[in-house]
Amino acid sequence: MEKDHLVEEEKKDKVESEKPEEGVTVPKVESNDDIHQTDTPKVDSTTSEGKLKDPVAVERPSINSTNTSSSGGFGNTVNDLSQPSTRPVTTAETSTNSNLPWDGNQANRNLNSQSYDLRVHLLKSLGIEDISRIDIADNKLLERFFSLHIEREQKEIEKLKTKNLEKLELIVDKFVSNEKFTNDTLNKLLELISSKSIDSHDLLGSSSIQLKRTEHSPNRLMSPRGHKRYKSEIPTVPETQYSHINYNIHGQPVNMVYHQAYQQVTPQTYYVPQGNQAWHQGSYTQGNRATFQPPSLANSNINNSEDVKLQEGVKVEPSGRARQRSSTSLGASLSTSNSTSNLSNTMKAATANEGKDTGSNDGHHTGSYGASNASNVMPSQVNNPNYMTYGSVRGGPYVMVQQPPGQQMATQYIPAGNQGFYQSVVPNQGHMNGMVASSQGYQANTPQPATSDNMVMLGNQYRGNETLHQDATPSLSSSTSQKRQGHRRTQSANVVLSTGRSPNRMNMQRQVNFLIHTPKHPPPT
């Protein structure tokens, strides 16, 4: 029963809503068929003044109805939806709707702003300015536009090619018609064109100058001492040059005969010819000694000045029986070295004629010893088969004789003049502390064959069977111990070479620099 009652009330409400109210004009709504048949829609709505509001106004159905039911409430919602209402649409609304890319296309509204702007920019670059009538969301449409644009560019390129060919033909015709144009000029033009093309290809090529690249190992970069030198980077001394080099207690190379701390003098070597050989037939290592004329034995001149320079390397090579006689006599005279009578008499005889004939000493200035002076010190040594090294160090000359392995002899110092036999052979006792060979400091041991290993060194180190007295030369152990006293981490370690080995057999050793880390001075972290 209640349902029937509700249905009757709804029917009554429908009838009342269909009746027109007084003062309200109901607009006539045309069907869709009428709208398609006529181009311009009919406008029935007027304003309260009786004039047309907008001549272009179009009535459209509105979903929300302004009419309310008499009963109030929401019972009239169905009638509101069923009855379409019209409202005028102005030109302002149509202009705002026309700003959209394609009015009525939902796909354009779903595009992102960035893609939309990009597509608009591309279309404008192709020459399309009015984009309002184009569906930008359609990808196929964009591809068509781009294909058309590419075709246009290709046509323009072909036009340029044809124009260039026409100009080239005209230029070639002019050159051919000219009499001055020959094959040589044509070849030159072709060479220029080919060279330009090659240069253009080689612009990015590698340069002819190869730069040296410094290779840094990761160990060097990670080390706290980045300036550390490796073994391969340190220059080595050849084996042939090492025989002339000696090392002191500090590990520094010094001259074997002359100490580095006082003065270094370049040694000079002379060649003494054989007994039967003329002096001009001998070979000389120094060019300025080519005119050297040795004085005779009677005209020997031994200078005792303090400015005498060092000379060494006299080589005597006699032959025959004189070799045996001289070797035996020289060995006998030198073996009795402890008694100075024989040598002193020899020196007196040699120096008796001092200053008699100075003009025969050609090629030498006053105060220097020549090869003849060394040979005149001991007359028996002129035809000696041995190697005789001589020189003088501010006190007088010395002679170092080396015997072949078959014979035995001793090596002696031979001073000049009236000086003592073993008196002050080393220069300047103040500079050479403890490096003086006194008369009590020389001891002749058992003779031994003098070879290249048994060599005389003045004051610094003595290599051979003959040894100096302990009072004359201080031991290396005491000197090194004094140097190592108060050793701190800032000082480098000293490498002392062995004194019992010859320099030829000695291995190459370098100064070793390292830090000693203690708990008080730990290594860097």
Swiss-Prot record:
Keywords, in A-Z order: Activator, Cell cycle, Cell division, Mitosis, Nucleus, Stress response, Transcription, Transcription regulation
Ranges of compositional bias, category Low complexity: 62-71, 326-346
Cleaved signal peptide residues: none
Chain intervals with Polar residues compositional bias: 78-108, 285-305, 470-483, 491-506
Region (Disordered): 1-108, 285-376, 467-506
Keyword Nucleotide-binding annotated: no
Domain of life: Eukaryota
TM regions (residue ranges): none
Residue ranges with Basic and acidic residues bias: 1-22, 30-42, 306-320, 354-365
GO biological process terms held by the UniProt record: cell division
An annotated GO cellular component: nucleus
Compartments it resides in: Nucleus
Function: Transcriptional activator which promotes cell cycle recovery, after pheromone induced G1 arrest. May also be involved in stress-resistance.
Family: Belongs to the POG1 family.
Name of the featured protein: Transcriptional activator POG1
Organism lineage: Eukaryota, Fungi, Dikarya, Ascomycota, Saccharomycotina
Designated gene of the protein: POG1
